[in-house]
Amino acid sequence: MLSRIATSSLGLSRSATGVIATQSRQISFDLSETQKEIQDAALKFSKDVLVPNAAKFDESGEFPWEIVRQAHSLGLMNPQIPEKYGGPGMTTLETALIVEALSYGCTGIQLGIMGPSLAIAPVYISGNEEQKKKYLGALAAEPIIASYCVTEPGAGSDVNGVKTKCEKKGDEYIINGSKAWITGGGHAKWFFVLARSDPNPKTPAGKAFTAFIVDGDTPGITRGKKEKNMGQRCSDTRVITFEDVRVPAENVLGAPGAGFKVAMEAFDMTRPGVAAGALGLSWRCLDESAKYALERKAFGTVIANHQAVQFMLADMAVNLELARLITYKSANDVDNKVRSSYNASIAKCFAADTANQAATNAVQIFGGNGFNSEYPVEKLMRDAKIYQIYEGTSQIQRIVISRMLLGHFAQNGTSRI
């Protein structure tokens, strides 16, 4: 009946409806065999290596170098670097699968392994061939770290508030300023740096900043002390100070003055990966909670038989599955060259909120034990919070989503994007 309606009412020929039917059959929510193999390999590594070591590195705060090296040798570090630069050449979706699996074991160790992704993105998007060969090639060849330097003590969500400045002198730029909360900052071999190149405060952000690749051994760079954070404690986070740091003009990413665009475009590429990290944590929360609920007894039966616990588990499962769908969709958008800040922001926002609620429920299901460091969910709750903060707070994501939604509705008369 529907085919007759489509043919007559919409004026479609039978050949056209046949094409539509064929295209609809191509929609699949199943991973390919290759993707399943990648996911299985990453999850095995996560359960065999990350899970047994998570508490140790959380307590010591040491950077997990040995695990990082193992991950690199298995092709699980920086998997999105193209083959032409020596990398595995995996898709954004495949990279998200790896992040999700590693985060199941420990989001802090995962960040140690995959932290360079945010620095990689602007080079991949805006770098010239020489820059890609040199800097992406180095990351593919060795288990080294690169860092994204944009956030400052007075400029987090407000990127336009960046005070680090650069001044062109001959064939060089001189950079001065400080960056804060820089992931991997203590070990980075190179930095992506955003600096104000136009001192006029009235200049639009799109023309006021220039982006650079800065080698980590350049004179004038000072790495501050490692920060003691609430969660993801083995991830190295520091203040990085640039004092009269001379950078050759050939290290400008994109065009001079176009740094803001370079920095922002990176987020559409990396936010699916951040969302995937939150997915892995939510997944672990659900597994730990289900296992505990089937073992712990109260009122003469396992607590899994109590409706209050069942409802918490059900809510965790519902949100996890929905977060997984939008995260995979946003990753697929990147792979299909569809720039969608809308889907990327929804994925990052919803997955982050889901992780925090999952961790809260997990601690509640564990009761007093959940508040104790002898059990894994206490760490999961501490690790979850940062997902609502870094790479764009959940509030910033909601601003992005609402602006795009309203703009689309004004043009098209529908909220469906």
Curated annotation (Swiss-Prot):
Annotated metabolic or biological route of this protein: Lipid metabolism; mitochondrial fatty acid beta-oxidation
Feature: transit peptide: 1-15
Family of this protein: Belongs to the acyl-CoA dehydrogenase family.
Organism the protein comes from: Caenorhabditis elegans
Pfam families: Acyl-CoA_dh_1, Acyl-CoA_dh_M, Acyl-CoA_dh_N
Binding site for FAD: 148-157, 181-183, 306-307, 364-368, 393-395
Gene Ontology cellular component annotations, sorted alphabetically: cytoplasm; mitochondrial matrix; mitochondrion
Keyword check for Transit peptide: yes
Predominant location: mitochondrion
GO molecular function: flavin adenine dinucleotide binding; medium-chain fatty acyl-CoA dehydrogenase activity
Catalytic activity of the protein: a medium-chain 2,3-saturated fatty acyl-CoA + oxidized [electron-transfer flavoprotein] + H(+) = a medium-chain (2E)-enoyl-CoA + reduced [electron-transfer flavoprotein]
Protein name, entry field: Probable medium-chain specific acyl-CoA dehydrogenase 10, mitochondrial
Active site: 391 (proton acceptor)
